[in-house]
Amino acid sequence: MKIFQKLLVPVALLACGVAYAQFPSVLKLVKSVVIPDSNIVFSVSNKAPKTDAEWAAVLKSAEKLVAGAQQLMPMGPDTGREPWVQFTQSLGASARKAAAAAKARNADAVVAAGDEMFEVCEGCHRM
């Protein structure tokens, strides 16, 4: 299931190509930050970090996702903004949980935050 998540996010993005084509900066941010950094958070479910460097990488990715969620918020559609704003806020909240868990070196909490993040991403792509 967890490996499936790594593959599903990019596939879901491709399925939303029409919506993202309207917002090229959204697509750029998703491809450059959201996908690679969420994959690092998701990877903890397959292999928990052990070294300082591995934990630092998870923390850095979670922090980049927090910033990315803040950058995404104003980029959404002009109409029907409420769901967009809710999803970007939820993405930021789950990324903050992942960052806190990485700081505490709590792999189970990182996985839980990653699962929450995955659900947020899925919900947004169903919009």
Please report, for each region that a protein language model flagged, where it lies by residue.
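Bacterial N-terminal signal peptides that target proteins for export
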Residues: 1-11
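A generic structural signal for short, solvent-exposed coil/turn residues
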Residues: 13-15, 33
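Sec/Tat signal peptide C-region and signal peptidase I cleavage site
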Residues: 16-21
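Sequence context surrounding c-type heme c attachment/ligation sites in exported
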Residues: 23-127
